[in-house]
Amino acid sequence: MKKLLLIAATSATILSSSISFAVDMGNDWYLRIDAGAAMFNKEKDKATGVKLKSNTTVPVDLGIGYYISENFRADLTLGTIIGGKLKKSGAATNAPFTGTNISASHKPTITRLLINGYVDLTNFDMFDVFAGAGVGPALVKEKITYNGITGLSSNTKNRTNISYKLTLGTSAQIADGVKAELAYSWIDDGRTKSKNVIYQGTSVSTGGMRYQSHNLTAGIRFDI
């Protein structure tokens, strides 16, 4: 948590410098909110070898940003996910569970703070097309549940990772000072902590799941 606060303070300082520059140039700043649907990449459960698939999760982001120039803007966003899981039922392939029919579920908790930059690639009368990238700290942990194996379920503690985000989207002005966005983003939030669980006298490694996601979101920007 201390690492996240330290990085957050550094991020805020960098954004503050951008704010001062933007104010000096007479440019506006804005608030934003985004939500949508996301799917995690397929991963393999470390303990059992079962290949996991994602359900649909809801990403939510709130942020504040500044128009640095006519075609470039930057913002600071705080984001999380709602309801995401990697899960699958099947026969385990890893010892000592080989052949056992199990159901595995990994439910992550992800909180990320990103500094993002966006460049307008084209400017049409009705809409703009933009590309962007973001980086910042993410707190990642997960709840691991097994049905069919007793005593293996566990929770991992928070791990501070560096999160990366790539975005391609379009925006259109829908009212004076209000723009709507539709965007695709790829996000890598890194891995959770690994944890050893004692199962019938044997140490079994769980956790260590990597969370990468494909996101389709709609958002609103309000000029202030």
From Swiss-Prot:
Domain of life of the organism encoding this protein: Bacteria
GO cellular component: cell outer membrane
Record's signal peptide: 1-22
Keywords: Signal
Pfam families xref list: OmpA_membrane
Record protein name field: Putative adhesin RF_1314
Species of provenance: Rickettsia felis (strain ATCC VR-1525 / URRWXCal2) (Rickettsia azadi)
